[in-house]
């Protein structure tokens, strides 16, 4: 119950999992991962398949965990906007670590540009 309260979903207690929206389900799963409260939380594409409103609420919870519980959070994400907004440190990986540092430094690096854009044509790689 305390973990559901931490993620702002105390009202979901007792609800059937099948009746929850994608965002609600993600917050319930996050609450499950928070009991007992860990020092490190690992997340892999945590809002995949969740609508924009659910994603926003989920990341508000993540921000709260980081600020109020001083929790270390390692997250895999391909959403560069989320990475820019939430990450203290970014690690760019493509078979190996290509670059790490602050989001702005990584996003402006040649390694980043080479990973996402064809240097000849200036087009995004598929």
What are these regions (language model features)?
Residues 16-20, 24:
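Conserved ABC ATPase signature
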Residues 1-12:
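Conserved ABC ATPase "signature" region
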Residues 83-85:
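A short, surface-exposed alpha-helical micro-motif characterized by mixed small hydrophobic
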Residues 37:
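Conserved catalytic motifs of ABC-family nucleotide-binding domains
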Residues 41-44:
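Catalytic Walker B motif of ABC-type/P-loop ATPase nucleotide-binding domains
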